[in-house]
């Protein structure tokens, strides 16, 4: 469905309620509710939804379009900083290494780095800004320090991800064109990369802890999945968006339970950001219900 300017505000405010009521009436279990939510978002937004949900203790999983390609958008900032941490583990850099922030580096959405122009930021500060506040300039500086987008793609391959690839920097990596494989991942591939970085042995325990620290604050994700989670749960997440997309990747650690990995991608839709954002909230709500069960 294409949304006109006259109905967008109504859709944005009513979508979450409509989807929640529909899933509550049609679905009997949280998994069925999740499936219904995905189907209704695809229908109402004219979108593709890719989702992978995995319980790492038992290996139980549920997915939809798990092998299809979706733009990573800002979710790529997690593996970018994973690559920084891998080099830290190897002794090739220090997180206290400082890089300059130049006026020429500025691109749209730089809430942290725009206040540091003319100065330096450490790699630690840049990764926190890139992940927690989704600062695009911080991400570009980090990508450049690694050797460019191709170095990030090589890092994906080194952790066993044959699918994900980075071809451009911010903001061009968000440009959507149907069928374009640049700057894409799949829900399944990103789930495995998150597992490798945060739960596997790709990084040292110290590096895994640092990545978790950068991801735990929810600077730009507070109203998404983590808003539905229990207070005692640990949520490590990163969101992303473009003109036709809205994404979230997360590790969910329930109190006393095994970690879950959730990757959610909404794409190929002309709906405005507010509509896509409400749809992502609905996906997060449905995922949390499955985890809580």
Curated annotation (Swiss-Prot):
Subcellular location: Periplasm
Binding site for substrate: 238-240
Active site per database record: 74
Keyword terms of this UniProt record: Antibiotic resistance, Hydrolase, Periplasm, Signal
Primary residence: periplasm
Stored InterPro entries: Beta-lactam/transpept-like (IPR012338), Beta-lactam_cat (IPR045155), Beta-lactam_class-A (IPR000871), Beta-lactam_class-A_AS (IPR023650)
Gene3D superfamilies listed in its UniProt record: DD-peptidase/beta-lactamase superfamily
E.C. code: 3.5.2.6
Residues in the signal sequence: 1-27
Listed name of the protein: Beta-lactamase
Entry GO CC: periplasmic space
Other known facts: The class A beta-lactamase family has a specific amino-acid numbering system, sometimes called Ambler or ABL numbering and often misspelt as Amber. A multiple sequence alignment was used to derive a consensus sequence and then the consensus was numbered taking into account insertions and deletions. This allows use of identical numbers, e.g. for active site residues, despite differences in protein length. UniProt always uses natural numbering of residues, hence there appear to be differences in numbering between this entry and some papers.
Enzyme class: hydrolase
Family: Belongs to the class-A beta-lactamase family.
PROSITE patterns from the UniProt entry: BETA_LACTAMASE_A
GO terms of biological process kind: beta-lactam antibiotic catabolic process; response to antibiotic
Example GO molecular function: beta-lactamase activity
Catalysed conversion reaction: a beta-lactam + H2O = a substituted beta-amino acid
Function: Hydrolyzes beta-lactams antibiotics. Rates of hydrolysis relative to benzylpenicillin =100: ampicillin = 27, carbenicillin = 25, cloxacillin = 0, cephaloridine = 4.
